[in-house]
């Protein structure tokens, strides 16, 4: 199924569905049977981001990378982001990424310009444990 090509009219429909004339964050491009369609950008309008969303998948399917991309994109658009990062997976957005051959090949194939950059980050620590600005949380009924 992954290597089957979508008919041209479906590709056109997807391209048109994600073409917004308003501020949006760019998630990537359409993968049509293993081939990136660089002019079919997958985007979410900023006004839609305040709604509920779900990122689900098996281990290794890109959930954390998707969250990083969303947080970085929102931050770049001037939208403050609060992310509860229990595992510490998102803390890397505080530093510029390290370019590599695989990343360069992927972004070039997707028609994306990639530059390493750091994002503004403040770290908080629940209950004063760990590094970061201590926060206290009280749960009551």
Regions found by a protein language model. Name each.
Residues 121:
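Short, conserved active-site loop motifs that form the nucleotide-linked donor/cofactor pocket
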Residues 1-58, 65-77, 81-82, 87-109, ...:
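Basic- and hydrophobic-enriched, low-structure N-terminal and domain-boundary segments
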Residues 126-141:
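ATP-hydrolysis module of ASCE/P-loop NTPase motor domains
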């Amino acid at each position: 199924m992954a290597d089957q090509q979508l008919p041209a009219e479906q590709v056109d429909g997807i391209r048109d569905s994600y073409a917004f004339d308003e501020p949006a964050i760019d998630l990537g491009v359409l993968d049509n049977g293993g081939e990136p369609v660089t002019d079919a950008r997958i985007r979410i309008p900023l006004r839609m981001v305040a709604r509920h969303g779900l990122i689900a998948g098996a281990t290794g399917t890109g959930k954390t990378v998707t969250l990083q991309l969303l947080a970085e994109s929102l931050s770049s658009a001037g939208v403050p982001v609060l992310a509860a990062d229990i595992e510490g997976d998102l803390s890397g957005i505080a530093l510029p990424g390290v370019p590599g051959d695989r990343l360069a090949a992927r972004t070039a194939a997707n028609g994306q310009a990639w530059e390493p950059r750091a994002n503004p980050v403040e770290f908080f620590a629940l209950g004063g444990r760990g590094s970061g600005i201590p926060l206290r949380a009280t749960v009551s009924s």
